[in-house]
Design a protein with these regions (language model features):
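Bacterial N-terminal signal peptides that target proteins for export
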Residues: 1-7
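C-terminal motif of bacterial Sec signal peptides marking the signal peptidase cleavage site
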Residues: 14-16
Length: 137
């Protein structure tokens, strides 16, 4: 009986070593999923205010604004941390009800494919948009 005890415990030991991995939006095989993770809709028609909120959010996340074009609705920023990340954010008015914000990040020539980067950006932007839309200073 003692010879079989280690064999019985082996599956439990292997399960205990399992780890979770971040969501890789490029490996999912669909551009639709990537677009959903990289895009948020806001119930406002104020594109200039949304652009200001995006700029403030990028600065709060330690990005340096490289270029902003209000007419095109694009903002490009770079963060110099352990690596250089470049993020481009596009703000587009959709219909008569909302504004769409899409972010796209790159490290060097490689697209950032983990969902966490975009979730972190939009978590801060969501708060900034809420405060701005509700006129909280």
């Amino acid at each position: 009986m003692n010879r079989f005890t280690p064999l019985l415990l082996m599956p439990f030991l292997l399960v205990g070593c399992a780890t979770t991995t971040p969501v890789d939006i490029a490996g999912s095989g669909t551009q639709l999923l990537a677009r959903q993770i990289q895009t948020r809709q806001y119930d406002t028609l104020d594109k200039p205010m949304t652009m200001r909120s995006v700029v403030a959010t990028l600065q709060d996340l330690a990005f340096t604004i490289d270029q902003a074009d209000a007419e095109l609705g694009t903002i490009t920023a770079t963060r110099y941390h352990q690596y250089t990340m470049r993020m481009t954010v596009t703000v587009v008015q959709r219909g008569n009800e909302r504004v769409s914000v899409r972010s796209n990040a790159r490290i060097g020539e490689d697209a950032v494919t983990d969902a966490e980067t975009y979730q972190d950006f939009f978590a801060v932007l969501d708060k900034a948009m809420f405060l701005t839309l509700n006129r909280v200073d």
